[in-house]
Amino acid sequence: MSKPSSRSSSDPQNNALLVVAMLAMVAVPAGIALHTVQIPAPTQIPPADATPYGYTVSLLLFIVPIIVIGWWFVPQEGIKIPKQAFWRTISLLFIAGCALDYFFANRFFTYRNPAATLRIPAPALGGPVPIEEYVFYLTGFIAVLLIYVWLDEYWLLAYNVPDYPAEAKKLRRLLQFHPTSLVLGLALIGLAIAYKKFVSHSPGFPGYFTLLVAGGIVPAVSFFPSARPVINWRALSLTLFIILLVSLFWEATLAVPYGWWGYQQQQMMGLFIGAWAGLPIEAVCVWIAVTYATVIVFEVIKLWQASERPLKDAFLGAREVPSRKTQAAGN
């Protein structure tokens, strides 16, 4: 039996493109099939008590994997999670998630079924939101990162980068501009604006999609060249598919049909999936952006810690001190 080529298993750029191709080979035919639904099946507005505490209980979709991986799989196999990098990543992302939820939750979402929650209000601009919103983001980030780490350190260990200090020493600085990510992000936002204006003909601006692209692209624009060689792309792709499966089940069959949360149409691109209770395409994109950004941030923090350099020097590069010989030549 022939062995896989070294390029297919070791070229980070090729692996990144393969992840995109894997996602596209599922998304494109699925999108074509869903587009054939010209007249969505009629839906009935359920009574308020149709799903008591539904949103609250559904958080188990994140909590159970966290418990199973964190308290069973990891200890059983003796996996050593880089705890400092893990919790620093979660802290950064959760703070960012809370800030976005505080400022934009009422702009992008609706919550018309309070009976599906504990009815505990959490602060947000424009009015309180269910406390479940903040728990949703916290457990979501932890679940995404824990799944990736478990796959990276155990299930797909063969594709792990074991020598982080060596990789870290190759980098003069972690902060490296990646123009391709910037161009791609601007192109996606431009396409969303054009679609909303010329195809969907719906009023408003695709603010939610713009925010998602920015959230996923900013880490890539800043750190992708540094993170690309150390990302376990197979672990990332499997994490992405697992999270997408969970989120689509969650939103398309439960959250949107039963009003746990909904979407402000003026802030959406205008591309809605009729077969999935009018779910906007942004609901599919959000966890792609979250998974991608989470992994990049985590790997960059691991590289920083492995470099054993101060924060400023690691991210911006140490300023070279001129030698006496160089100074003499200058004089």
Outline where the language-model segments fall.
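Aromatic-rich, lipid-facing transmembrane alpha helices and their immediate juxtamembrane interface loops
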Residues: 2-331
